[in-house]
Amino acid sequence: MSHRKFSAPRHGHLGFLPHKRSHRHRGKVKTWPRDDPSQPVHLTAFLGYKAGMTHTLREVHRPGLKISKREEVEAVTIVETPPLVVVGVVGYVATPRGLRSFKTIFAEHLSDECRRRFYKDWHKSKKKAFTKACKRWRDTDGKKQLQKDFAAMKKYCKVIRVIVHTQMKLLPFRQKKAHIMEIQLNGGTVAEKVAWAQARLEKQVPVHSVFSQSEVIDVIAVTKGRGVKGVTSRWHTKKLPRKTHKGLRKVACIGAWHPARVGCSIARAGQKGYHHRTELNKKIFRIGRGPHMEDGKLVKNNASTSYDVTAKSITPLGGFPHYGEVNNDFVMLKGCIAGTKKRVITLRKSLLVHHSRQAVENIELKFIDTTSKFGHGRFQTAQEKRAFMGPQKKHLEKETPETSGDL
């Protein structure tokens, strides 16, 4: 019998305890990037929805590496990011105990998909949310008070954040209730931030005004839920030998006799997945525009490159599984991210200043795969499939409609 190594590193990370279900569905930003007044005023985060994954082909441009100027096939994630709507401004003052909310000002008109978030049952409610806040914009006294509030923000506040919500009507979901989030404004003075937010109330903010091509960002989301799992699946502990009594996928020793209790560091069965996680340094491969009009023509070739000039959309044949079509702006991120399909994803500007070759590398894609994700796809576009497979019966019926003869 061979020698057994009696010392081994523990299984599982203790830095994320307790492994329980997250009480929030949307990723929360707990730390914002450091403010730089020398930069123009800008948002520091954005909201999107995970659509699915595909792969790309590109040429690596990192001087000094052996793989430089070689082609690489890399997996990417598509996050659909319709424009956000600014509906409010929040000012924070600095106190000895941290930041405290000073003033909150909402816009005059709020859409129903935003107001639905404040009701548990929208259908049975009286739908009177924000009626008093909206009246302030209409009478003379209310307008004067609003100007005083904006002036007080400029005078006393240290941090300015805007309240934004997503547009569910632009997405292929049944859900009508929008996701609402506070996003911090960085850059410029406090007066410039308040003026920026005041000028964009009830207006849309696109994703390309927040992030840029080849930028490194952070992704905050809730992971895919996997229910109650055993200790082997949850903590990746070693399976016991075959002849072990009463099961193999267990932990044989759960601690000493004394202290007479099971310690918190002992691997146990329980909830796996649906945890709040922040993943740093995700590279943006492309920020694509949805279908739009240019010179009177509808442009949908947001998956074309300088090498692959085929007019094709980022949506693969048959759509993304369990999601559908991507008909809005999108962000293409390198690798995988947390969450399942249709999960709301929080994209935040990176907290760090990056100087590595990999972080500052300019991304130039040669090819983006748009084959069907339901099986072993081989065709990039529907036209390519039709040219190879031949016309279907429905296409022939459209071209030569049958003429009914007189009886």
Swiss-Prot record:
- Note the effect listed for R161W: In CMD2D; uncertain significance
Q: What effect on the protein does mutating D308V have, as reported in its record?
A: In CMD2D; uncertain significance
Q: Name one GO molecular function term.
A: structural constituent of ribosome
GO BP annotation list: negative regulation of myotube differentiation; regulation of striated muscle tissue development; translation
- Associated pathology: Cardiomyopathy, dilated, 2D: A form of dilated cardiomyopathy, a disorder characterized by ventricular dilation and impaired systolic function, resulting in congestive heart failure and arrhythmia. Patients are at risk of premature death. CMD2D is an autosomal recessive, severe form with neonatal onset.
The similarity annotation says: Belongs to the universal ribosomal protein uL3 family.
User: What is the recorded name of this protein?
Assistant: Ribosomal protein uL3-like
Q: Which organism is it from?
A: Homo sapiens (Human)
